[in-house]
From Swiss-Prot:
Record protein name field: UDP-2,3-diacylglucosamine hydrolase
A GO cellular component annotation in the UniProt record: extrinsic component of plasma membrane
Gene source species: Stutzerimonas stutzeri (strain A1501) (Pseudomonas stutzeri)
HAMAP family: LpxH
Keyword match ATP-binding: no
Binding site for Mn(2+) 2: D40, N78, H113, H194
Amino acid sequence: MILLISDLHLEEERPDITRAFLHFLATRATQAEALYILGDFFEVWIGDDAMTPFQESIARALHALSERGVRIYLMHGNRDFMIGQTFCHKAGCKLLADPSVVQLCGEPVLLMHGDSLCTRDEGYMRLRRLLRNPLSLFVLRNLPLATRRKLARKLRNESRTQTRMKASDIIDVTPELIPGVLAEHRVRTLIHGHTHRPATHDLEVDGQPAKRIVLGDWDRQGWALQVDENGYHQAPFALS
């Protein structure tokens, strides 16, 4: 059995989500072969050199799960794309490229965070290209901590404002893009997060049935996708 989650947006200001996640790690996740976290694990991440005691505690909890033999994979999201190898070492997890094709219960599956699929949001896509540029990342990682914190607050506030102002379809995945993405990677299943719109979308690629599974975000409730010999099953659960 394999579990996939995304968009927890962990932060000290949401202890209810943190408690639910720690409970998830100590119970359901212990039964899994692997746990995949597909981005926006943290609400903000300004660098491994700026880890807070809160973030350190999350790393320890993940490491405890890895010591039980559960493989943990972490993918960058748009909020935490500066997570590096120092955190992954402390957490006992492996950083997973976006996109990645992995084997889930014998089937090749494409995993993505999902923000790169929202191509109608042209302003965000320009910002994404700028921030993910290797030179930009080098500069960001070498800014003083105070500057990084200020910049992170500014970007987060602007993101929230823009999300409220933009039309719903603009900040969602561009559906016409999906068949081509699946065909390019030679898979029939795509799993991603980012949009906070949990659902399974059936489609057709080269005359064959395919599907796009969107992971739910942890806010009013938690979400996890379970993959096993019976297929794919995603369901919400209470945070408390």
